[in-house]
Amino acid sequence: MDWSALQTILGGVNKHSTSIGKIWLTVLFIFRIMILVVAAKEVWGDEQADFVCNTLQPGCKNVCYDHYFPISHIRLWALQLIFVSTPALLVAMHVAYYRHEKKRKFIRGEIKTEFKDIEEIKNQKVRIEGSLWWTYTGSIFFRVIFEAAFMYVFYVMYDGFAMQRLVKCNAWPCPNTVDCFVSRPTEKTVFTVFMIAVSGICILLNVTELCYLLIRFCSGKSKKPV
């Protein structure tokens, strides 16, 4: 998967984010996408080929692998990153729509006094207020939901975050209970715990930013005259 397009889009969103949001984006790309692209694929590249079971029964190895690893860690992480990044794309769409409306009004001569030219509209930093505040805050809320949901899925699907060295399988067509051995279990456990820890950090950053936006919103309301 090519992550450069996603990085370009989210980089545009980063211009309109809070300081906490910029830290979140840095953590997302450096500690998650880069690790996933550069390191994790090397560790999980041999997962099915080196999944060995002590039986020659045709199909038994494939069935056992599918039973214990219904979805590859790499693919589930990639899916998680897509879901977590999608709400930020809503902010990018909102900003694009805002600028489009500003350009349309400028061309029609409705806001000639606010901007010198269209280039100034393109370079304008959009403040997180009004309808954009709701879009931005909603995107953070859904990011927290997606992060927590995927952490729960990881824990339930793989029966914890530690990779077992030995698993026992008695699924059909295995003739009896067979022993299957996982390749690089310790290394995979380290990567899994690291990715889960980074997910937890992202949740903490998102919750902090959400609280910051809510406090700023409430303080702004209280300053308005009754």
UniProtKB/Swiss-Prot annotation:
Keywords for this protein: Calcium, Cell junction, Cell membrane, Disulfide bond, Gap junction, Hearing, Membrane, Metal-binding, Transmembrane, Transmembrane helix
Intramembrane segments per UniProt: 2-13
Gene Ontology BP, a term: sensory perception of sound
Membrane topology listed for this record: Multi-pass membrane protein
Localization annotation: Cell membrane; Cell junction, Gap junction
InterPro entries per record: Connexin, Connexin26, Connexin_CCC, Connexin_CS, Connexin_N, Connexin_N_sf
Cytoplasmic side: 14-20, 95-135, 211-226
Any single Gene Ontology cellular-component annotation: plasma membrane
Gene Ontology MF terms in the entry: calcium ion binding; gap junction channel activity; gap junction channel activity involved in cell communication by electrical coupling; identical protein binding
Binding site for Ca(2+): E42, G45, E47
Disulphide bridges, residue numbers: C53-C180, C60-C174, C64-C169
Residue intervals passing through the bilayer: 21-40, 74-94, 136-156, 190-210
Keyword DNA damage applies: no
Topology Extracellular: residue spans: 41-73, 157-189
Keyword Disulfide bond among record annotations: yes
UniProt similarity note: Belongs to the connexin family. Beta-type (group I) subfamily.
Description of how the protein assembles with itself and partners: A hemichannel or connexon is composed of a hexamer of connexins. A functional gap junction is formed by the apposition of two hemichannels. Forms heteromeric channels with GJB4. Interacts with CNST.
Biological role: Structural component of gap junctions. Gap junctions are dodecameric channels that connect the cytoplasm of adjoining cells. They are formed by the docking of two hexameric hemichannels, one from each cell membrane. Small molecules and ions diffuse from one cell to a neighboring cell via the central pore.
UniProt-recorded name of the protein: Gap junction beta-2 protein
Species of origin: Ovis aries
Source taxonomy: Eukaryota, Metazoa, Chordata, Craniata, Vertebrata
